[in-house]
Amino acid sequence: MLSYPGELQGCRVILYLVGHHLYLIPTTISMCGCPEEGAYMRRLWGYISIITATIFFGISATLDKIMLSSMHPVTIGAYTYIIAGIFLFFIRETPLREHVLNAINRKGESEARIKRNDYLILLLTALLSTVIAPLLFLTGLGDTTAVNASLILNVEVLFIILLGYLIFRETLQLKDFLGIVLIILGAVYLLTEGDFSTILRNVAVTGNFLVMAAAFFWSLDTVLSKFLSRKRDLIFISGVKSSVGGFVLLIIMLILGINTELPLEMLPYALGVSVFSIGCSFILIYIAIREIGASMVGALFPLSSLFGAIFAFIILREPFSIMQGISGIVMLTGVFILYWNGK
């Protein structure tokens, strides 16, 4: 039986990534024991890596929102994940591959072989994280603001904890219940926009709930991906998941007769999400895990939601009210409490 303070914290690290995208990694890959010489610089690079990853991931909602002005959600999802898959497979064929894999894996603690049953789990999680979840997210994003969408994604950690408890019987500490309550309080305000009287007639509220539904499917992917987390070649697994999702969405696009055009002016935004928000964030997060530990990365990565709201406010000129800010901070506090180990 897994223990939440250890294993589940490691799981959350990947939540967002693969949240847009990948899978979880148990805390056992955390490698904070740096040698004395250069230890400070290694930890510094670890913090720089995770902050950079949060910025890259945070801007994704804003870039998606811009693309929604000219493209269908299915089209955006298809091209985004196809490009991400190409990028990850490209990285896998470069010398950077071994550096990334060595940062992820500990000698003797990873499995080199991917079994037949693993491919079934890989297919299932690919459908959850790169087909269903992005469709819900992009459709919801079209009806709400990127500010709200970024902040609402924090409910992923709540779903991961609840699913971990229900499926794997993860143990919860007293402080975890406080964190859960804070996340729920912040989410309730953001989901309803503080107006319960018009909740059923408010299009923006519908969009908010679609974003929350996307967060659920991404969290389900994270929990189920536990069965893949000990594989050595996680770049391959991530590339397969992205590619499967992209091509499934492409098939859906063709069957439904959706416009397949990727406007030239939208190409930089699609590349930004695919290469930086998905691909580079994936690599940077694992580097950070190696240098500063999974728990610290898990506590810092939710800052991506705050960066996302700030980007939407500055670039899209979306409203960012004081109450939205307070709700976001309340949720971030809840996430931090869930990851805080008292050390």
From Swiss-Prot:
User: How does the protein's chain sit in the membrane according to the entry?
Assistant: Multi-pass membrane protein
Where exactly are the transmembrane stretches of this chain?
Answer: 13-33, 44-64, 71-91, 121-141, 148-168, 177-197, 203-223, 244-264, 269-289, 296-316, 320-340
Q: Where is the EamA domain?
A: 55-192, 216-340
Principal localization?
A: membrane
Q: Name one GO cellular component term.
A: plasma membrane
Question: In which domain of life is the source organism classified?
Answer: Archaea
> Is Lipid biosynthesis there in the keyword field?
no
Name the keywords, alphabetized.
Cell membrane, Membrane, Repeat, Transmembrane, Transmembrane helix, Transport
Q: Where in the cell is it found?
A: Cell membrane
Q: Is Repeat one of the keywords UniProt gives this record?
A: yes
Which PANTHER family does its entry note?
A: INNER MEMBRANE TRANSPORTER, S-ADENOSYLMETHIONINE_S-ADENOSYLHOMOCYSTEINE TRANSPORTER
**Family of the protein in this entry:** Belongs to the EamA transporter family.
Annotated protein name in UniProt: Uncharacterized transporter MTH_841
